[in-house]
């Protein structure tokens, strides 16, 4: 049971790991918590483990590096493989791939540490409008996000995001509903609509606040739910996901769906969305954990 790790999302991973470990032990699995920060994962196989439930979040656990190590030692593991994990950690390249497949994403401008000096806020606002969303390409859990409401705020928002990553996305603001859709073994589960207390679903709303509201079913018409499920499955297949993943989707002001990002190791805490979605189709937390484990390759 891989949990903890070295990324900014270490604590979230511990919370997920605790819940999953409990569920596995309750069902008679011989499961042990392993924190890669404290233990050399290359020794897992020779220490007698025969599969890994990977609930690490963020860099070093969800970005293809851990997956590659587990492939090297020949240990089956849960979730996406090396390529899908590495690709989806990079929001910019994920969106470029989706765009190439003809799938809908927000309009964006990419800024790097090297190109920051040439950033022309006026030109960006002329192209994308206001407000804008500024975010690091690689950080998960909504770390480093800023909503920019005026052209003068853009540079400082990008500077702030550059503390977390070298590549920054400046995106058109999507004013419609925020949705997240879980996929389990190629089955698209019911969408969840997220209504944060603040202006957007940030770290506080995700992990701390009890005032964020979640609606599942999401209140979409059957036709819209079907349209969303088809879109999400195409997005999941395009990046090569397997086992389980959660895809975030926003609506623009006109209600058009826009793909946002993929979570290849979704959270599994009491606040988490994947278990909420599974529960609406009669899959208990314990059943979900076992199903994810059974899908490990």
Swiss-Prot record:
- Chief subcellular location equals cytoplasm
Gene Ontology biological process terms in this record: cell wall organization; peptidoglycan biosynthetic process; regulation of cell shape
Which transformation does this protein catalyse, written as a reaction?
A: 2 D-alanine + ATP = D-alanyl-D-alanine + ADP + phosphate + H(+)
Please list the GO terms describing molecular function: ATP binding; D-alanine-D-alanine ligase activity; metal ion binding
Give start-end of the signal peptide: none
Write the Enzyme Commission number(s) for this entry: 6.3.2.4
Associated pathway: Cell wall biogenesis; peptidoglycan biosynthesis
| Keywords tagged on the record | ATP-binding, Cell shape, Cell wall biogenesis/degradation, Cytoplasm, Ligase, Magnesium, Manganese, Metal-binding, Nucleotide-binding, Peptidoglycan synthesis
Localization terms from the record: Cytoplasm
**Names of the cofactor(s):** Mg(2+); Mn(2+)
Matching entries from HAMAP family are given as: Dala_Dala_lig (MF_00047)
The name this protein carries in UniProt is: D-alanine--D-alanine ligase
